Amino acid sequence: MSKIISLVVAMIAVLALPIRGQQQPLSQCTPSMMTTVSPCMGFITNSSSNGTSPSSDCCNSLRSLTTGGMGCLCLIVTGTVPFNIPINRTTAVSLPRACNMPRVPLQCQANIAPAAAPGPAATFGPSMSPGPETDPIVPEPTPAAQTPQSDTTRPFTPSVDGGAPTSDDGGSTSRPSETPSSAYALSPSLLFFSIALVALKFY
């Protein structure tokens, strides 16, 4: 029993270190907080019938977020919520002023500023492939003594490793890169919960 308790305490300590050091701002918006601001969705996505001003329900839900969900409110106002919502940044930024809450953008700057330089993130699972290099690739000049190529193109032949096809004449193909929406990271709390279940199963 004491081994399991010490294992659980060690896991909590290990999982709490990256969380305390990083405080990712995107994790501050939960689905329940997004439900709270659902009256504002029509306004910040430019799909409301009113279009020019938010409803009183929207402003009230915005005020309720200032007490317990300022981080989420800042993400909504800046248009960087971690959900797939087509937020119009211009109308989202104007939302606090339209609701007569002019201090919200200043509070958001103070709230977001420390999270601008997080430490290295520990992710579990596939990560995005690196982007293209900034230095342009300059092809080497071809020597003049080469034999002339025929005008007909050669057909593509599959490579030995079965990967992407290549051509005999030096042509290249590119592999599709992983998009941010297809990349994922495993939540530390989910990892902890899974390990705790395994530990309890063998107890």
Swiss-Prot record:
Glycans are attached at residues 46, 50, 88. One of its GO terms (cellular component) is plasma membrane. It is a lipid-anchor; GPI-anchor. Residues 144-156, 169-179 have a biased composition (Polar residues). Expressed in seedlings, preferentially in hypocotyls and roots. Also observed in siliques and sepals. A lipid is attached at residue 172 (GPI-anchor amidated serine). It is found in: Cell membrane. Residues 1-21 form the signal peptide. Disulfide bonds join 29-74, 40-58, 59-99, 72-108. Pfam families: LTP_2. Keywords: Cell membrane, Disulfide bond, Glycoprotein, GPI-anchor, Lipoprotein, Membrane, Signal. Residues 119-182 are annotated as: Disordered. It comes from the Eukaryota. Residues 173-203 form a propeptide. Its main location: membrane. Probable lipid transfer protein. Belongs to the plant LTP family. This is Non-specific lipid transfer protein GPI-anchored 20.
